[in-house]
């Protein structure tokens, strides 16, 4: 393939089309049209919680609980993410999408052109329209996602049954519940993370008198940052978390506040 433009040229080698396998016809178990903007964003948001080791394959991907509503979950044995989406699929099923396949879906979805509404009379409906994708459970443990008429992705799903994610969520009222400004908490954790990293990676959080004190202890130093909370019930109380877990959760949050709950005695 040769490309020529008014400032230069470029040549790229090509492969013979017969070297690429033809996708076989596969029976479809169930299919439906889904809001791709919501689904893909939720799957990408779950990626940081996926296990990175191969010892537990069912934790190495993002779980989709299909039905009405669709749920997205992931966990690595230490933490988990669970999202309930306002979407539906005509068949109730649980599938596990490999982590690398989720990244591929995000890339293809970002590059696929929007399909404008058939009755759009201005640019606004085209720009703001939700991007729909067609999803089908097909073949033997596979899922196919069609991005309009321009691209399709067929994924081999992870074999096995995912955990019962909701059973891992503690029931009952939390011992301590606090609402804080997410960007402010993120800044406080970043302020102490160097010392936390020098120690055991732990960030301590103490709730008292309407304040939250975030601190870390290293080998030869200690650092802390104090911030106001919006609302706290159950104080005084304290808890501790790995700083990377906190930052993975807080990083890029589009909301101004976040709620922290502990279900074990936090004193």
Where in this protein do the model-derived segments appear?
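Structural preference for solvent-exposed beta-strand-turn elements
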Residues: 1-267
């Amino acid at each position: 393939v040769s490309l020529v433009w008014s400032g230069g040229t470029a040549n790229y080698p090509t492969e013979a089309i017969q070297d690429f396998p033809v996708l076989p016809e596969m029976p479809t178990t169930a299919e439906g049209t889904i809001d791709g903007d919501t689904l893909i964003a939720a799957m990408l948001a779950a990626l940081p919680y996926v296990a990175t080791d191969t010892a537990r394959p069912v934790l190495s991907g993002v779980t989709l609980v299909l039905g009405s509503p669709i749920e997205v979950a992931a966990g690595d044995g230490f933490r988990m993410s669970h999202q309930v989406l306002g979407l539906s699929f005509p068949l109730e099923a649980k599938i596990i999408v490999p982590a690398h396949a989720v990244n591929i879906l995000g890339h293809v979805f970002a590059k696929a052109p929007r399909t404008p509404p058939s009755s759009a009379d201005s640019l606004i409906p085209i720009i703001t329209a939700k991007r729909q994708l067609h999803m089908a459970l097909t073949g033997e443990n596979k899922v196919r996602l069609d991005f309009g008429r321009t691209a399709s992705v067929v994924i081999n799903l992870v074999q096995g049954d995912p955990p019962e994610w909701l059973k891992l969520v503690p029931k009952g009222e939390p011992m301590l519940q606090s609402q804080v400004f997410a960007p402010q908490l993120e800044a406080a954790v970043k302020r102490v993370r160097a010392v936390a990293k020098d120690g055991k990676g732990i960030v301590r959080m103490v709730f008292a008198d309407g304040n939250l004190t975030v601190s870390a202890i290293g080998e030869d130093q200690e650092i802390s940052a104090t911030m106001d909370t919006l609302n706290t019930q159950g104080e005084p109380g304290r808890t501790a978390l790995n700083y990377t877990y906190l930052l993975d959760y807080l990083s890029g949050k589009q909301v101004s506040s976040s709620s922290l709950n502990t279900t074990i005695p936090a004193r």
